Amino acid sequence: MSKLFWAMLSFITRLPVPRRWSQGLDFEHYSRGIITFPLIGLLLGAISGLVFMVLQAWCGVPLAALFSVLVLALMTGGFHLDGLADTCDGVFSARSRDRMLEIMRDSRLGTHGGLALIFVVLAKILVLSELALRGEPILASLAAACAVSRGTAALLMYRHRYAREEGLGNVFIGKIDGRQTCVTLGLAAIFAAVLLPGMHGVAAMVVTMVAIFILGQLLKRTLGGQTGDTLGAAIEFGELVFLLALL
């Protein structure tokens, strides 16, 4: 289990992980690591939240929110933001399904992808600022948002097909079973409930689950399945929806 966690941490983040900690784990078995996604999200969100708490007293709420979002992006290497941009470039191109998938593989940033990045990053900064001004616990909110967004991404893997013949997303999409999905969602729900007592955290997770499920169905209808890019888009979308649901 520990090898799976370290393997997933090095796979979906840029945090330094000694290679020996995940050595010997077959890449084809990475799908079992989906249950570690909420824990990894919890770690990323906690670090981002700590950055906010440290900087808030020094430079104020807006700049603290800006740097916490920046740190979160840096820790993932912009991995999920890149998926969001590619997904929006492809889906909003209004081309054929095959052409959309080709556009999503293009390394160049298009207009729709650029607009999506600007909107999501600015929205996160503004929502975090508003939550802080309302006295909400930012560290707990960010930790829960990152845990839930990565946990609910399982909804785009379970009983979905991979839209391409090959790619990194194929490790997870269509490869996880119902038990793994329930465990992943259950862990995310526990983190949300513990970090944000009462029904606040759980209610925000339910809203996020519904939003991610609908997004998954729309992407499935448009692209014929999911890709690594759509998983990244779902994680970014899930973070924003969860934070918005806390307002």
Curated annotation (Swiss-Prot):
InterPro entries xrefs: CobS
Pathway: Cofactor biosynthesis; adenosylcobalamin biosynthesis; adenosylcobalamin from cob(II)yrinate a,c-diamide: step 7/7
Co-factor(s): Mg(2+)
MF-aspect GO terms: adenosylcobinamide-GDP ribazoletransferase activity; cobalamin 5'-phosphate synthase activity
Superkingdom to which the source organism belongs: Bacteria
Main location: membrane
GO biological process: cobalamin biosynthetic process
EC number from the UniProt entry: 2.7.8.26
Record field: catalytic activity: alpha-ribazole + adenosylcob(III)inamide-GDP = adenosylcob(III)alamin + GMP + H(+); alpha-ribazole 5'-phosphate + adenosylcob(III)inamide-GDP = adenosylcob(III)alamin 5'-phosphate + GMP + H(+)
Membrane topology classification: Multi-pass membrane protein
Keywords: Cell inner membrane, Cell membrane, Cobalamin biosynthesis, Magnesium, Membrane, Transferase, Transmembrane, Transmembrane helix
GO terms for cellular component: plasma membrane
Pfam families: CobS (PF02654)
Keyword match Transmembrane helix: yes
Enzyme's top EC category: transferase
Residues that span the membrane, as ranges: 34-54, 59-79, 113-133, 138-158, 194-214
Cell compartment(s), UniProt: Cell inner membrane
Function text: Joins adenosylcobinamide-GDP and alpha-ribazole to generate adenosylcobalamin (Ado-cobalamin). Also synthesizes adenosylcobalamin 5'-phosphate from adenosylcobinamide-GDP and alpha-ribazole 5'-phosphate.
Entry similarity comment: Belongs to the CobS family.
HAMAP family: CobS (MF_00719)
Protein name: Adenosylcobinamide-GDP ribazoletransferase
Organism: Escherichia coli O6:H1 (strain CFT073 / ATCC 700928 / UPEC)
